[in-house]
Amino acid sequence: EYHFPPGYRFTLDQKYRSPWYDRECKRGLPKHLIAQELDIDFGGSGRTFFDPGELKQLEGGCRNPVLTGAVSFDEGFQEVSFIESKGGPLRLWCNLDPIGLPSREEDYAIGADIATGLAGKSASNSVLSVVSLVTGEKVAEYASHDTPPTELARQAVALCKFFRGRTTFGAFLIWEDNGPGASFRKAVMEEYEYTNVYYRRSEEHALKVKSKSPGWYSTEKTKLILLTEYGIGLRTGKFLNRSFEAVRECGFYVYVDSNKIEHVKVRGTMDPTGAGENHGDRVIADALACRALKDRPTLKLEETKAASMSNPPPGSYAQRRRERDLEKR
């Protein structure tokens, strides 16, 4: 007979539980994975990848953007500035300093999902998602359905320079390399010679050895891993998403097989950028930005963390950790 530790906090949900089971649940696993992997209940895992109830809760942390517009820049990206305009492709959830730049006390990463850029009723958006590497908060989103991959590369490099933070070179850039991603990569690295980029790792190798191939490549397995990591990031507050559209798009991902995830192409008018068919582009861009939180180049962030963690974003993992630390004192 097993005896639980004194004062153990039981979860009363009419399921067989144990300390090990409770620890696994607290890791932030999605409900469908708990049902499938822990309860061995494949019917309970359902067909939607992201839990609808959790997405509804996440919408409570979404905000209207602080600013909307676009970046203006010269040919060499030496002068990059923000130009405010209603209906612009770039939305900011961060304040700019007196000279019109984002905080220089943080570092940033940008996730990119690249579409063909063929404008039309069923066109998919190309999306750039900007995240603070210190707080995990999404601070900006660029979305356009009529920007070709090579032009998106130019916009991405400009945005990297705009969100260069404490670096002299710019934000860490990660993109999906499939399809039009190849043209994007060539423009970023060869034409604009931007090299602060993600190099994919072998998902099969235990040590996840870094390869010499830039960009993230999507397969059934790598997509499942990426979106699972992203779901955990959302659930634990390590990735704080402020975009209503981005959170709602998560609800369109479903299982079409035991381990295959696809986006259900839903026609609608909820997308303010004009793309009548949403292909989950924001979700992939956000998931890649989330990947960058743990896979960017090692930087000395101690001083920056100390400054930023003194007032972390509400609802973030950092805020909850700070509250736990205060309770222990």
Predicted regions and their residues:
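Mg2+-dependent endonuclease catalytic cores in nucleic-acid-processing enzymes, primarily RNase H-like
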Residues: 132-262, 319-329
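Short, flexible loop/turn elements at secondary-structure junctions
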Residues: 42, 54, 59, 114-118, ...
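Phosphate/oxyanion-binding active-site loops and adjacent basic polyanion-contact surfaces
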Residues: 106-107, 123-124, 145-156, 223, ...
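Acidic active-site catalytic centers that drive phospho-/nucleotidyl reactions
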Residues: 113, 176, 281-284
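Gly/Thr-rich phosphate-binding beta-strand-loop-beta motif of the actin/hexokinase/Hsp70
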Residues: 103-133
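Non-catalytic, compositionally simple segments
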Residues: 1-110, 236, 240
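Short, solvent-exposed helix-loop connector elements
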Residues: 260-276
